[in-house]
Amino acid sequence: MLVELEDLGKSYFTEEVETRALRGITLQIERGEYVAIEGPSGCGKSTLLSILGLLDTPTAGRYRLNGRAVEKLSSSERATIRNREIGFIFQNFNLIGDLSIYENVELPLVYRGMTRRERRSRVEEVLERVHMSHRAKHFPMQLSGGEQQRVAVARALAGDPSILLADEPTGNLDTRNGEAVMDLLAELHEYGSTIIMVTHDARFAKHAVRAIGLLDGQLVDERIAASAL
């Protein structure tokens, strides 16, 4: 099992007031699954994704990632796992404007200490996979929103992560480009990628094999795509 959550909770405390962002989350995700976590703004989706991505820690319950008890890891151990095993796709793309598309995708590999030849091979491979090889020498401002999100997906893939976490990946896109990004994620899933996506849009949640509803910090329902039955 790749992801195991047991009675997971997250609370924030301010001036002796407790705000429970997540409560009683129990969930298992196997390697190779495509899961959408769907719910309205403020329901805890981004908090859950931050915990899954080791950017935040729960205040209750247990989280095991690839068999490791996350709550027992040090900050440096979490950072190492995050950098090597988790790919992030953000709503705002988070591309660096002064770097070319090639350089944006290459940057995480530089920090890993890969050789120039290794980096070139990997960058070319992932740009081809997201159909953006022809844009390698361009800069983010020269691309449409849909194209920038494709580059963001390529960057997330570059390190060959165990899991892709997508935070509202269609949030800044029109319907046509949003559907194109959803088609790309479905294609990556067919290649074997494990994908967990949070979205407020039921139309896009339907693209996942499993759609899990989140409301007021709690899991409320789960649906399996008809194609998976």
Label the predicted regions:
Residues 2-214:
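ABC family nucleotide-binding domain
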Residues 72, 224-225:
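Short amphipathic beta-strand/extended segments with alternating polar/hydrophobic composition
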Residues 211-224:
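H-loop (His-switch) and adjacent beta-strand-loop-beta switch element
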Residues 227-229:
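ABC ATPase nucleotide-binding domains
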